[in-house]
Amino acid sequence: DDYVRMPMGPYAAQRIADSLDCTLPTAYLVDRITEATEGHIDVFPFRPLGERNCQPIVFQDSNNAIKALFKAHGYKFGQLISGLKKDIVLSYKLMTLTDYKHNVAIYGWHYPSGRVLQPLYVRHLDYYVDYSHGVRLIYNKVLIDGVEHDIREVLQSPALYRLLSDEP
């Protein structure tokens, strides 16, 4: 019970992912994961007041709000529940548009109805972090028709990437 959900930037998220043989999801995968969750909590955005949402006290406030919502719904730590945070995601836009090469892609924070609060957004610089950002990791080994593939290779494959991404 002694923990706090801490946001981080994309470089720290990727370093952790690499150390665990994982990758960040695409927006498409975030939607599929949301559809498969065991439950959902309501989105609870804090009103931005200057840089307040980037301060550690708001990280703690957000964590406390999530804990209270889990308790209210009877959810347990470790269950796959959606609605907690926006995701830092992989995006074709960051890889191909030079205007965004030093930015972070965020997406998600789904309402219980399934509607997304944050469409894919790539305009924050890569050092920007606020309480609403979360990191979800996906193991690099995936099965396609019973054959194991590396997810990074699938995302690079013109024939297969559509299984994991809906970006052009």
Model-derived features: positions:
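Detector for Asparagine
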Residues: 53, 63-64, 103, 140, ...
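Generic structural hydrophobic/aromatic packing signal, biased to beta-strands
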Residues: 33, 90, 106, 135-137
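Conserved hydrophobic ligand-interaction patch in extracellular adhesion modules
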Residues: 10-76
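Second-shell loop/turn segments in exported
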Residues: 1-6, 19-20, 123-124
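Extracellular C-type lectin-like domains
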Residues: 67-130
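Short, glycine/acidic-rich beta->alpha junctions
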Residues: 5-14, 129
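Low-complexity, Gly/Ser/Thr/Pro-rich intrinsically disordered linker/tail segments
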Residues: 124, 128-168
